[in-house]
UniProtKB/Swiss-Prot annotation:
Domain PTS EIIA type-3: 9-107
Function: The phosphoenolpyruvate-dependent sugar phosphotransferase system (sugar PTS), a major carbohydrate active transport system, catalyzes the phosphorylation of incoming sugar substrates concomitantly with their translocation across the cell membrane. The enzyme II GmuABC PTS system is involved in the transport of oligo-glucomannans such as cellobiose or mannobiose.
Segments crossing the lipid bilayer: none
SUPFAM superfamilies assigned: Enzyme IIa from lactose specific PTS, IIa-lac (SSF46973)
Name of the protein in question: PTS system oligo-beta-mannoside-specific EIIA component
Keywords, in A-Z order: Cytoplasm, Kinase, Phosphoprotein, Phosphotransferase system, Polysaccharide transport, Sugar transport, Transferase, Transport
Species in which this protein is naturally found: Bacillus subtilis (strain 168)
Amino acid sequence: MEQMKITNLTDEQISFQLILHSGNARSCIIQSLRAYKEGKKDEADALIAKAEQDLSAAHDIHFQMIQKESGGEATAFSLLLMHAEDHLMSTLSMKELVKEMLDLFKTKNI
């Protein structure tokens, strides 16, 4: 996935990009668990990998935001940004939990 540059985006567009990528990742994570339940283990792994790509894109955007702010350009706080941050962080937690669950299922042949 190509890295998006946030330099020409508004704060709202940046927030929506975070929501977009973390939302896509969240969907893949849930689909992964469902695929595993249906016995489609390879598909489950592929969906986790796809989720990680979207989370990587979100992380890149987030990192650019931090770099921008550390360079003296303040980020405007908004409810939308807070929602985007919450969405990203909860999706990261969900990914780690589901990966651990899938590993457990595999080791126990569930």
